[in-house]
Swiss-Prot record:
<dbReference type="InterPro" id="IPR011773">
    <property type="entry name" value="DNA-dir_RpoA"/>
</dbReference>
<keyword id="KW-0240">DNA-directed RNA polymerase</keyword>
<dbReference type="GO" id="GO:0003677">
    <property type="term" value="F:DNA binding"/>
</dbReference>
<dbReference type="InterPro" id="IPR036603">
    <property type="entry name" value="RBP11-like"/>
</dbReference>
<keyword id="KW-0804">Transcription</keyword>
<keyword id="KW-0548">Nucleotidyltransferase</keyword>
<dbReference type="InterPro" id="IPR011262">
    <property type="entry name" value="DNA-dir_RNA_pol_insert"/>
</dbReference>
<dbReference type="GO" id="GO:0000428">
    <property type="term" value="C:DNA-directed RNA polymerase complex"/>
</dbReference>
<comment type="similarity">
    <text>Belongs to the RNA polymerase alpha chain family.</text>
</comment>
<feature type="region of interest" description="Alpha C-terminal domain (alpha-CTD)">
    <location>
        <begin position="249"/>
        <end position="317"/>
    </location>
</feature>
<comment type="subunit">
    <text>Homodimer. The RNAP catalytic core consists of 2 alpha, 1 beta, 1 beta' and 1 omega subunit. When a sigma factor is associated with the core the holoenzyme is formed, which can initiate transcription.</text>
</comment>
<dbReference type="InterPro" id="IPR011263">
    <property type="entry name" value="DNA-dir_RNA_pol_RpoA/D/Rpb3"/>
</dbReference>
<keyword id="KW-0808">Transferase</keyword>
<dbReference type="Pfam" id="PF01000">
    <property type="entry name" value="RNA_pol_A_bac"/>
</dbReference>
<feature type="region of interest" description="Alpha N-terminal domain (alpha-NTD)">
    <location>
        <begin position="1"/>
        <end position="234"/>
    </location>
</feature>
<dbReference type="InterPro" id="IPR011260">
    <property type="entry name" value="RNAP_asu_C"/>
</dbReference>
<dbReference type="GO" id="GO:0005737">
    <property type="term" value="C:cytoplasm"/>
</dbReference>
Length: 317
């Protein structure tokens, strides 16, 4: 069985806080950029676990359409503010779906922010400046938020069915996904071979409760664990190497141009053009090589003959 090229994967751009990342994987055979990109995108959006509030309890409020004396916002507005809360709940301390309580009680006039919440061990609020409500003169806010780790999106109706929900709680919609945006695309690349290759470009942005690189790694592991089930369908399958080690051709492409036995004039022209390896040489079109400053017809012929002798080709226009 013909081996696939083993791609390299890396970060090409990252925000200072690492909540945004741009990643590339190459070389991939034609069609694999879309196959892998779509699978990663769907898994990132639907299956990345995170933390969210699923219910609240406010003293003096029985439902979300209540107004509270001394509080500027009604319960509906408080719920909308709570939905913006970004949490991180330590999965090493709390099991999946284990409820944690975040509390605040105050009669101090002014805004009540997420940083005012009293948190149990292993729980962190990332957007502490978020205003949850404003207390007016004579008002008192006694608020409990119920949160947990999970996946996906749950409506307030679905959350009403949870065993932890008791009378007095107001359930809300909960979005557990920490992923804000995922985009992917592909671009063709030239390796100096007749076969078509492409590059996967993946962009991921999170809410800060998980790093973009960690989210991509986790999504990959989720996919691998599911695909692994299908490898057991046949008990007797000949072991084949799908991803081979670096081939002789690949190693040859990384050879410095100094080792290609060019004349000194041709070598100097290539070096001045920023071409240091055979890979960089064949990634250029023939027109680009011809346009290299001070490269004469004799040197051009020498370079073309060398590339042809190695059974490689220049990038197509």
């Amino acid at each position: 069985m013909k081996q696939f090229n083993k791609p390299e994967f890396g970060i090409v751009k990252e925000s200072p806080n690492k909540f945004y990342g741009k990643f590339e994987a190459a070389p991939l055979e034609r069609g694999f950029a879309v196959t892998l990109g779509n699978a990663l995108r769907r898994t990132l959006l639907s299956s990345t676990p995170g933390a969210s509030v699923f219910a609240i309890k406010i003293a003096g409020a029985q439902h979300e359409f209540t107004s509270i004396s001394g509080i500027e916002e009604n319960v509906t507005r408080i719920v909308l503010n709570v939905k913006k809360l970004i949490l991180r709940i330590d999965s090493a301390i709390y099991n999946d779906d284990e409820t944690v309580e975040l509390k605040v009680g105050t009669s101090t006039i002014g805004p009540v922010t997420a940083g005012s919440l009293v948190l149990p061990a292993g729980v962190e609020v990332l957007n502490k400046d978020l205003v949850i409500a404003n207390v007016a003169e004579g008002g008192n806010l006694d608020l409990v938020l119920y949160a947990k780790n999970s996946r996906g999106y749950k409506t307030f109706k679905e959350n009403k069915e949870l065993k932890d929900v008791v009378p007095g709680m107001i359930t809300i919609d909960s979005n557990y996904s920490p992923i804000i945006k995922v985009a992917y695309g592909s671009t063709p690349i030239n390796l100096g071979k007749a076969q078509d290759f492409e590059k996967l470009i993946l962009e991921v942005e999170t809410d800060g409760s998980i790093l973009a690189s960690d989210a991509v790694s986790l999504a990959s592991k989720i996919l691998i664990s599911h695909f692994d089930v299908f490898t057991t369908l046949a008990e007797e399958v000949e072991e084949v190497a799908i991803m081979g080690v670096e081939t002789v051709e690949e190693k040859e492409l990384d050879k410095p141009v100094e080792e290609l036995e060019f004349t000194q004039r041709s070598l100097n022209c290539l070096k001045r053009a920023g071409i240091s390896t055979l890979r960089e040489l064949v990634s250029k079109t023939e027109d680009e090589i011809q346009d290299i400053r001070n490269l004469g017809r004799k040197s051009l012929k020498e370079i073309k003959d060398k590339v042809a002798a190695l059974e490689l080709t220049f990038k197509q226009n």
